[in-house]
Amino acid sequence: MERVKLPTLKGFNFKFDRDMIMPLSEEIEEFIIATPSLKRVKFTTQIPKDIQSNNIIEGIDDDIEAIRRIIGRKLIIDTNDNQDGKQKKVLNLYNAYRFILEKKDIDKETLRELYRLISDGLIDPRDQAKMGEYYRRDEVCISNLTYFDERITGVPYRIVDKYVDYLLEYIKTAKAENYTDSFIISQIVHFYLIFIHPYFDCNGRTSRTVAM
């Protein structure tokens, strides 16, 4: 098991099993090489497809051509309308992708702007009122599903800032020597931001975009 300099709430660091991943290394690298959207230089041409994949994860099955039309027309969106709400999510992701592609570094200000772009017009006003300058100022429930013994929550809001700083330092210092390393780093970043859950909503979209 390999330790990552990202602490749990109990104080010890998270670990992952590289030995389980390495047998898949060749398959991972072949997949990345064969997938244009995973290579940053070609990603701009693949944005509609990635937006579609991002939405499918959250149960929104948009047609790829519809996504292209939404992006191309820059529609005026009424977020109170259910259909327009879906279109707003498409435009927000498009703006967030374009923003993150121009950034070389992920820092606190970059993360705040990225979240602003992704969440624009989509946050419940009651939750928006409890947002701080960067992160939430109250607890958040991730799941109330009955098959869990207890409510699943994010990191306590008073230490969110500190835990996001741990993640930003990891992003800054993590070194990738090959495609497999890059894949592992991206998955760790995705997981840890979800673990923190620094916002009331749009955590998944933000974490997937940061992990790009």
Where would I find each of the regions flagged by the language model?
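FIC/Doc superfamily catalytic core
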Residues: 1-212
